[in-house]
Amino acid sequence: MATANFGKIQIGIYVEIKRSDGRIHQAMVTSLNEDNESVTVEWIENGDTKGKEIDLESIFSLNPDLVPDEEIEPSPETPPPPASSAKVNKIVKNRRTVASIKNDPPSRDNRVVGSARARPSQFPEQSSSAQQNGSVSDISPVQAAKKEFGPPSRRKSNCVKEVEKLQEKREKRRLQQQELREKRAQDVDATNPNYEIMCMIRDFRGSLDYRPLTTADPIDEHRICVCVRKRPLNKKETQMKDLDVITIPSKDVVMVHEPKQKVDLTRYLENQTFRFDYAFDDSAPNEMVYRFTARPLVETIFERGMATCFAYGQTGSGKTHTMGGDFSGKNQDCSKGIYALAARDVFLMLKKPNYKKLELQVYATFFEIYSGKVFDLLNRKTKLRVLEDGKQQVQVVGLQEREVKCVEDVLKLIDIGNSCRTSGQTSANAHSSRSHAVFQIILRRKGKLHGKFSLIDLAGNERGADTSSADRQTRLEGAEINKSLLALKECIRALGRNKPHTPFRASKLTQVLRDSFIGENSRTCMIATISPGMASCENTLNTLRYANRVKELTVDPTAAGDVRPIMHHPPNQIDDLETQWGVGSSPQRDDLKLLCEQNEEEVSPQLFTFHEAVSQMVEMEEQVVEDHRAVFQESIRWLEDEKALLEMTEEVDYDVDSYATQLEAILEQKIDILTELRDKVKSFRAALQEEEQASKQINPKRPRAL
């Protein structure tokens, strides 16, 4: 029965074959392979003998005259077909069997070529329908065979089959995503005042090919990684019928559909595209964000390096959610934040043999920077001093380091710190985190620093619109936030381009994180969080531009020698520029001046004057408070001395000369110290007035029209 499947094919005959490039020529049959129902053929090409193995289906499709001549037993239910069409009908029946399973590659046992494996009832039905159409008698057997078999199908390798399976899954996934988008599009609210814009966004999204980031995507190595995370619309935005104007079509692209209005009041969309290392849509969980951002940095601290991870964005865009964990109402699940996930991996790494032998100890600190001041969140918000020692190492005096043994210890510290972090109300948000929260995981070996991982939840970046506020405290908050974000950007710039000088003294944030920007084994990741609502479009664009600016600075490391010069003015205007900006007289002022020069598009001379006035005022405030505290302590000693003098006067024969001399000495000392303190207070009040006048000189930028 097996040899019958080969029909009239014999060893030594010539058959037509089709090459992979489409050519058809003759070749001689050299062997018949019964195990896999194929034949081996050989031919001579350019003087060389070549050969290949071809399955019977392909041979019969090109050589229909070699098909087996078996008689088909007719069905008892219908009369037998005419003899003239019997051969054609056998070919038709064979084709129907193959076509019915073409979507699923057949096994060797189920491949059907001869008629003995087909159902007998199929034959008369096919032949009778063919007779009714009058097509069988009008064509030759060869033409019918070519027509019914169609183009020859080649056997597929396992690799091709796997690729087809992956492609099928991909197409299925895209179809599901398309159906989901269409379902969302159908749920539009025609009563929405922005219905026209909503339709424009829907039509634009319909033309995109979506390929979002998945956990199967590879993790790239970056010294500076910049990514963006979009959050979903919250309940308040949904109730206000706000629109989602952010689209993330692929793993590294973010698109903003900014509504605009022409002079004739016609509304239109301005679609702006940004590209980053990674882009996370609103369905990405914290674990996925951590996998691509902070997780690659954990190993850095075990290799004696410094790692830094920032969460940056508008208030309410998801920074604290990303760093601290999921919120359920007002309660936060700290175990799902990047703080805890990083700590978990640190303790897992400690168990590896190559790190276990180092006998490393893990410590944690948690502090906040508010209006240029540093407070310890693990020690009842004690105010700390940031000083630079003789070795140019920045020391946070009084900062407590708590040793942690497991992830649960870390979660407890995070709960303690989050409970007392500073927040307030601004013109941009009713509940704004107005401080930079810095959580550090420190590795020490025999008491010496081995590595440090700094995780920073930055304050809301509402572009410092509050620098022109009537409230001084709000002004100072906004000024410090803006200055620290500018300084952070320039420090990352210096890190990415290996610059000899890093302007870390320009703000308290970068001063505290100095060791994270100095050294070859330093790595940084920035997570820019954005709100999807149309009402937040301006702040979202500002966040993306800031992140894009940071990424631009590190896109082409080979162009480090072609860095834009700091000075953008001809040499003969340097003196005028020095006059305009003023001459720095301290390291802090020099770095601030350098910072403003490198960001002239964002920082005007008036704004630089304001920042300078704020810095001077903050320094004087610290000095006045410190002197006042010293005077208070001295006053306690004065009271004791005066009490002793008064007790001496109660004696009958006390020494009047001694009493007068001692009292005069106490009064002179009081006058000298209090006069000095009074002069400093006067200077401090003058600095307050100067800051207020400088704030009035700032030209507020006009908001971008929607």
Curated annotation (Swiss-Prot):
Residues noted as binding ATP in the record, renumbered to the chain: G313, Q314, T315, G316, S317, G318, K319, T320
Outcome recorded upon mutating H321D: In CDCBM3; results in abnormal cellular localization with predominant decoration of microtubules rather than diffuse punctiform cytoplasmic and nuclear distribution as observed for wild-type protein
Coiled-coil portions: 660-699
InterPro entries reported in the protein's UniProt record: KIF2A-like_N (IPR054473), Kinesin-like_fam (IPR027640), Kinesin_motor_CS (IPR019821), Kinesin_motor_dom (IPR001752), Kinesin_motor_dom_sf (IPR036961), P-loop_NTPase (IPR027417)
Modified residues (N6-acetyllysine): K102
Record region (Disordered): 66-139, 165-186
Region (Globular): 1-217
Disorder: Cortical dysplasia, complex, with other brain malformations 3: A disorder of aberrant neuronal migration and disturbed axonal guidance. Clinical features include early-onset epilepsy, and various malformations of cortical development such as agyria, posterior or frontal pachygyria, subcortical band heterotopia, and thin corpus callosum.
Similarity section: Belongs to the TRAFAC class myosin-kinesin ATPase superfamily. Kinesin family. MCAK/KIF2 subfamily.
Record's protein name: Kinesin-like protein KIF2A
Organism in which the protein naturally occurs: Homo sapiens
